Structure formats: structure tokens, C-alpha cells
Amino acid sequence: MSYTEEVYERVVAQNPGEPEFHQAVKEVLDSLKVVIDKNEEEYRSMSLLERLVEPERIISFRVPWVDDKGVVQVNKGYRVQFNSAIGPYKGGLRFHPSVNQGILKFLGFEQTFKNSLTGLPIGGGKGGSNFDPKGKSDREVMAFCQSFMTEFSKYIGADTDVPAGDIGVGGREIGYLFGQYKRIRGLYEGVLTGKGLTYGGSLIRTQATGYGVVYMLDEIMKAHNDSIDGKTFIVTGSGNVAIYAVEKAQQLGGKVVAMCDSNGYIYDPEGIKLDIVKDIKEVKRGRIKEYADRVEGASYTEGTGIWNIKCDVYLPCATQNELALDGAKTLVANGCKYVVEGANMPTTLDATTYLQENGVLFMPGKAANAGGVATSALEMSQNSMRLSWTAEEVDAKLHGIMVDIFHKADDAAKRYGMKDNYVAGANIAGFEKVVDAMKAQGIC
């Protein structure tokens, strides 16, 4: 049995009931086998893989708060501080009923490689709670956020751990969290990113992940003598990542014909009218089906199956494991040529393999959606220097980072004889920087 197989079996045995974490570790270790085999004894002697797959610290705490009826509610809060070899922990907070330790470990593990790929000095972490902000009043959300931060503030800081938003944590929640941190600690520091522009936030942060996904796609296409102009897109999801991926794709000449939310999907053969989607999702906080009521010629379909629509480019920007093998087979049969992940691990392992084996150019989320955390790190830099860059400056830096990530993944894949295997390339490139830092810092 190889070293990578031994480590994977150990992960499964020691972390039962955490399938997302197992999946993330397997994908990375499978890619790294060609690297590890070249110098297995050194990696074994320092237990580098065992340390790489084990979080440095997992924090769990209760979050009591009072709802609008005066009833005390109790939720669970978590922070997985996965790896700080190349910088302070950095990664989002997710407020959603599905949140548990296993999902946060998978996200923190992925975040470690993603942050490494940006070239910026940030380690990997992830946190959140099983609290659901949907259907809660502003006062209830504030009460929860203040209680969460009262405990959470003990473990974070501008040079220790700098969280950001994620699913269920937007500008409102970040504001409440930052206010409570400042109140408790008496410090006005860049301890959170995704802040409002009036109190230390960065321009382009909201758009960054979605824009970055399309910048990555553009670079892949250029490498294959192709372009976005005139291509037909499907973009799953209708949150920040999806909306701004659509915006940038349309700016570069793409035609987006379908989007979705957790209830179903819309199809507009004339091209999605993004201003209407923004009004529904960002202003009214409504459901995507309202689009079909407002746009003549558009249709709404309940449930899944958005991949049945023909497209050249498929951008999964909703949630983990949304695209399974059946969907991948349909995409291939319909002539899809590019799949670039906007969400974290939205494609199952067997679907990823099928897409790659059938000539689809596939870029994993740890590379493609790194624009969000990269711009968070740029926000940290602005906070440290007490500066505020223009939107054009931030966007130019974001674009440069995404181009650089593509070339890191592309070069690593070619170096190991796996041209166009961007999954392996991204994993190898991210791994090399982290593991070099771990070696230099000794057994810790």
C-alpha cells in the first residue's frame, strides 16, 4: 500500500461520518501520488501528509440567543483552524442548518490549497454555525451574531485568524460581527473581511469570486485558442458568486441562458436579464421562479436538471456535490466543453473523472473560485496600510492573481506529464508551497 493510500485509510477510520472531508482528501491525495512517490521517505519521516490532513485546531462552542418571542435558542458554533504554515488562518463563516464539523473540515482543507495558490500569505480555515438566518428578523440575526462573536472573539485577530462571509453570512452579518468584536476587544482592526465600505471594506469584494471564475475561464480558453465571445453559458446558483459570474461573462460577450436556486431553474433563450435577477435576489430576497413571471419567453422548471439545457460552458456556483455523474454525462452528450467550479467542490469525484476523460476542460473550485479569498487578502492589506484602493486597482490585482493561478496549475500539470489536468495541477501547485513552509518550520 502506498503512503497516500495509508494516509487516506487513516483519515476515513479516524473521521467517521464525514463523507465530504473524505472526498476532499481523496481528490488531493490521488493527485499528489506522483509527487509523493518521488521522495516518499522524506515525507514519511516527517509525517507530512498526516499533518497536512489534520487540522491544527478545532474550536466548538454553544451560541445562546433570544428570539423575538423571548424564547432562548441554542445553536452550535465552530472554527476549524486548519493550517497556518504560510500565514494567519483565512476562510469564511457559513450560517446554514447543514453546517457540521465534517463539512467545515472539508472546506478548511480545500481553503488551505486555495489560499496557497493565490500567492498571498494566508493559511486555511473555515467556520460557522447551524443557525439559519432565513426567516429571521434583523434583531434576531443581530442577537445571534453578537452571541456568536462574544465567544468567537477569543480565537481570532488580524494576525491570527481573519474570517470572512460565506453562505448565510453577508454584509449584514459581517457588520454585526465586527461591531461586537470591536465592542468586546476594544480594537478597530482588520479582523474580518467583507466589511462595508464605510468601515474598512474593499471595493470589488462582493463581485470578486464570480469575476474571478470568469477570468479563470478566459485564461483557459486563451490557452486553447478560444474565447468567451458568443459562447452559451449555464450558471448554477443565484447568490453572489453566480450573479457576478453572469455579469462578467456577459461583459465579455457570453450568453447566459439558465440560472437556478434550491427550488428550481429558469431558462431564457434570449439571455438572462441580470438586472431582473438582481432585483429578485438582492433587493426582494425572492425565489428565482419569479423571473419567469416577469420575462416573456422565459420558463421555470421545478427541481434539478438544469444541465439538460445545451451549453458550451457550465459554471456550477451553488453548493457542494450539485453536479453528479448523470449530469456530467448529459453535459458531455450536449457538447459542453468547459466546466469551471464557482462553488466549493460542486462536482462529485466520478463526475469530475468522466468530464476529464471525455475532453471537457475542468477547473476545480480551489483554483477557480480563489478570487474571493484573494480579494479578502487585498482588503487585509488595505486595512494594514490604512489605505483604500480604487475599484480599478483592486480589479486589476484580482485579474492578475487569477491569471497567475491558472499558470501555476497549468505548469504543475505539464511538469508531471498531465497536460490539461487542472485538478492535479492545482493540487500539486498548492501543496508544494504549503509543504515547503511546513518543512522549513520543523515538526509543529
Where in this protein do the model-derived segments appear?
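Flexible, glycine/charged-enriched surface loops at secondary-structure junctions
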Residues: 19-22, 38-45, 119, 156-165, ...
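Structured beta-strand/loop patches that form or line metal/cofactor-binding pockets in enzymes
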Residues: 41-71
